[in-house]
């Protein structure tokens, strides 16, 4: 009489385990993909959110210097620099200065691309104490635009700012002796295209 092998059905517990593992792996892959995408989207979203809400010590922007004379009161301004995911070195030329309230001051940061190819970054920024953000005003800043550095390039980047005179009128700032301006450079995956140079003559000056 021929031997007969019993029918063995797959273990339902094992099948459930395999299905669960596949689901977990899919979720983990999705989370990693979202995290990678978020890292590149972080700077524009962060800047937009902070400008819109005033969150996290976001500074103000002005086109011109204040019309009033600087006040007698002074405050120390410290400069902080950080890099996240870029082959750059990034340092302030001065770590700390003292400025009068309402005085326009230009500070410089130095950045070097240590990679063997061009890279692009953009800086996120804030000031602390966070409540000072509404008084700390920038007229010009490298953080307003993307920065593309050639291989080995070093660049000096200015930031022109002042502390609004209304800072001194707010009693909550009486104890504030030091303001820290902090920048963190993040990589830009797809830099904005540079405009092509125009071949049309400059109508303001005519042909030279």
Curated annotation (Swiss-Prot):
- Cytoplasmic compartment: which residues? 1-19
Transmembrane intervals:
20-42
**InterPro entries (UniProt xref):** CtaG/Cox11_dom_sf, Cyt_c_oxidase_assmbl_CtaG
* Short name of any one Pfam family annotated for the protein: CtaG_Cox11
Disulfide connectivity for this sequence is: none
Q: Which domain of life is it from?
A: Bacteria
Primary localization: membrane
The record's subcellular locations are: Cell inner membrane
What are the GO BP annotations of this UniProt entry?
respiratory chain complex IV assembly
Q: Give me the Periplasmic side stretches, as residue ranges.
A: 43-208
Q: How does it sit in the membrane?
A: Single-pass type II membrane protein
Q: Which GO terms describe its cellular component?
A: plasma membrane
* Entry GO MF terms: copper ion binding
Q: What does this protein do?
A: Exerts its effect at some terminal stage of cytochrome c oxidase synthesis, probably by being involved in the insertion of the copper B into subunit I.
Q: Which NCBIfam families match?
A: PRK05089.1
Instruction: Give the similarity note.
Output: Belongs to the COX11/CtaG family.
- What HAMAP family does the record point to? CtaG
Identification of the protein by name = Cytochrome c oxidase assembly protein CtaG
Source organism phylogeny: Bacteria, Pseudomonadati, Pseudomonadota, Alphaproteobacteria, Hyphomicrobiales
């Amino acid at each position: 009489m021929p031997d007969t092998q019993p029918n063995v059905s797959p273990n339902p517990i094992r099948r459930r385990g395999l299905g669960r593992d596949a689901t977990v792996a899919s979720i983990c892959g999705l989370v990693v993909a979202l995290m990678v995408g978020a890292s590149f989207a972080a700077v524009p979203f962060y800047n937009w959110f902070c400008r819109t809400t005033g969150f996290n010590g976001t500074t103000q922007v002005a086109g011109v210097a204040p019309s009033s004379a600087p006040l007698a009161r002074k405050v120390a301004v410290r400069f902080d620099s950080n890099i996240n995911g870029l082959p750059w070195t990034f340092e302030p030329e001065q770590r700390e200065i003292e400025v009068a309230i309402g005085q326009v001051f230009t500070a410089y940061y130095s950045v070097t691309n240590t990679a063997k190819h061009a890279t692009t970054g953009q800086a996120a920024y804030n000031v602390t104490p966070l409540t000072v953000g509404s008084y700390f005003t920038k007229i010009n800043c490298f953080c307003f635009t993307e920065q593309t550095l050639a291989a080995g390039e070093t660049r000096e980047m200015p930031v022109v700012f002042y502390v609004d005179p209304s800072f001194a009128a707010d009693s909550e700032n009486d104890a504030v002796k030091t303001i820290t301006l902090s920048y963190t450079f993040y990589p830009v995956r797809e830099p904005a295209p540079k405009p092509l140079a125009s071949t049309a003559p400059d109508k303001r000056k005519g042909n030279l």
